[in-house]
């Protein structure tokens, strides 16, 4: 069943969707996606789809940018020693590379210092700053760090080493007294976009220093922006679009080497490539050891240097993947302990867990359990533990843990992620605070939500439509890749794939392939399912030069049949033994069956059902669609259906000749007693029901009169088509409905009967 709580995004008004679809010449579902993103007209669309540096904000709108630029230019002019102090993740490495290239282009020769994750830690380090000052550094420019470093920066500044802070992380209560603090959310600033990455801030500083956006570095800014999971909206979208285009068409030497080592063609690079190919490789440097080679790899012009470093990061990434798999398995086993299953949050700690990958492991545990999680490595001496936490949308991890800061040696982070160091004896207190916060933030442990953009029909599932969706890329925070609900009629060729059969491949309608990573266990369930809802993303697959649409499975729901098929041509009474409520449309049929059979539950007339009714059986045929619709407003699925119709009720409408035979009989027998209709039936070789229908039609068309019990023909009646009689039309509609209800395949019948129910389920 579902791993997620599906959450249908607000759907635009049909009129708005239609208008935008017509204006842009795009399918309605794409108009829905655009409207959900605030794109309401052609101008909005052009601005969203086509990147333009004119949509980048003035860098001097950032607080302290003028001070930062003045101090940096002064250092360059006076040939001061400058050190760029970066960070060991992708955002930090790309920020450092941007600042390095910018200062070099202005004639400076700065040093770059990337702290060691394990010995220096994140952000300003007092020993490192003292070393920098001792070795002659006169200006430190922090990139992707520093805003929380007042305890280190203030003494350094007071001792004569100037610091310019450029950062984007959570703002602490006390900011450092640096020469400048350039931050998009500075409390004294009013920059129009607060969600720049560290690389984005470095790019803005570079723009201010150079007088124009350094487009030669926009690829680096895009890498940091995408990898750091900041919102891909506003100018971040422009940076990401321009940067990805540069990587696709003119990749720098180091990135070309990474892509070659990974077997990825540059022209296919997109945000997914950054997230799953480039990003993990660069991050592996800092996670597994020294990240400084990352800056060299990103800035070198030498092919052999790039190739050697790319091979190194590839091997480190493989090693990192092995560690993650091992630790994640151990952590998930611990999560199954009774005390952890009962908890709303998890704090899992052990010796021997590599500190460089605990954040990734935490993400995997959150994904598997839906619980905010801290993964802590206990030092060899058992005294301290260091780790990372990841969270879910409903639980602000930083705020949850902030009251427990007194129990931590180091602590920092934001809504969805934190890093901390603490004494092992304080871990129970920290977890207790997590649980206390969960009591208010999380009433229950919810399934993680899966936003559904809209529902797609079979006709929407085309390669051309996938290409249209890609126009909305790059996808990420603030611009999520659309997930769609689809309801295939066919699930076939279900097969487990992968070395451990932990993935899945199957086909749906039109032979479209669906790939489900991590869904290998669902093979049997999907192969035998009668009704399935899929949550998917559209993708493409190229094999032997042929490109086709494929769907990526994000979740699925196997529905129990909402219509239980008890239809059969004869009734023997065995169908009525179940403890259900038996609903009849025809009171005469109800009376007849009650005389013939015993029922395991109550019987009722459909017209009398005026409240929700569960466990119902629809026994006979409704007289018309309105009667069926009326009862379906109250019948709760699953509902069993028999739709029995006695053969006498299902005889065909008389032919024109047979109608004529009845009319001639009545003309030959004026004043005929209607109680003797069986005599007419015998004379003209029709059933009694057919003759009754003919008389009703003749009466409605003024071909006969009926006074009391006597039927008399009208002399020289006006000619009227038989089909214009209400009785004729009603009989035709009844027979058509009966044909549908008795012969329609179960799945189609379910759709017909329960559209309202199934729609509300998908949207919930």
Predicted regions and their residues:
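Hydrophobic helix-and-loop "lid/oligomerization" segment in the mid-to-C-terminal part
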Residues: 2, 14, 19-139, 159, ...
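Short, ordered loop/turn segments at secondary-structure junctions
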Residues: 87-88, 115-118, 145-146, 168-171, ...
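Extreme N-terminal flexible tails
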Residues: 1-19, 744, 749-754
